[in-house]
C-alpha cells in the first residue's frame, strides 16, 4: 500500500441530537469537537437521525400504502373480503 494516501480511519462517537443517544463507531470524518465516552476521549460527530431515532428502527414508521394488490382488486370489482366473512 502507498503511504500517506489513505484517510485517517479512527474511532469516533456519534451523538444523535434528537434523542441524545451516543454510540462508538469507526469513521474518517474529521471534527474539532471531542467527548468523553467510556473513560476515553474521542472525536464527536453530531447526527440528526440515527438508529435510535429513525422511525424504521424504532417501530413508529407509518406506511403510506396500506392497501395491497388483492385489496385494490377486491375494491375495484366490488368483492367482499373472504377472510372477514369467516
UniProtKB/Swiss-Prot annotation:
Pfam families: Ribosomal_L31. PROSITE patterns: RIBOSOMAL_L31. Keywords: Ribonucleoprotein, Ribosomal protein. The keyword Signal does not apply. The keyword Ribosomal protein applies. InterPro entries: Ribosomal_bL28/bL31-like_sf, Ribosomal_bL31, Ribosomal_bL31_B, Ribosomal_bL31_sf. Part of the 50S ribosomal subunit. Belongs to the bacterial ribosomal protein bL31 family. Type B subfamily. This is Large ribosomal subunit protein bL31B.
Amino acid at each position: 500500500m502507498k503511504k500517506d494516501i489513505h484517510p485517517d480511519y479512527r474511532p469516533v462517537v456519534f451523538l444523535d441530537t434528537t434523542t441524545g443517544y451516543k454510540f462508538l463507531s469507526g469513521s474518517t470524518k474529521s471534527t474539532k469537537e471531542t467527548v468523553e465516552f467510556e473513560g476515553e476521549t474521542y472525536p464527536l460527530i453530531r447526527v440528526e437521525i440515527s438508529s435510535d431515532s429513525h422511525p424504521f428502527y424504532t417501530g413508529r414508521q407509518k406506511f403510506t400504502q396500506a392497501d395491497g394488490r388483492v385489496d385494490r382488486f377486491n375494491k375495484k370489482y366490488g368483492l367482499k373480503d373472504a377472510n372477514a366473512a369467516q
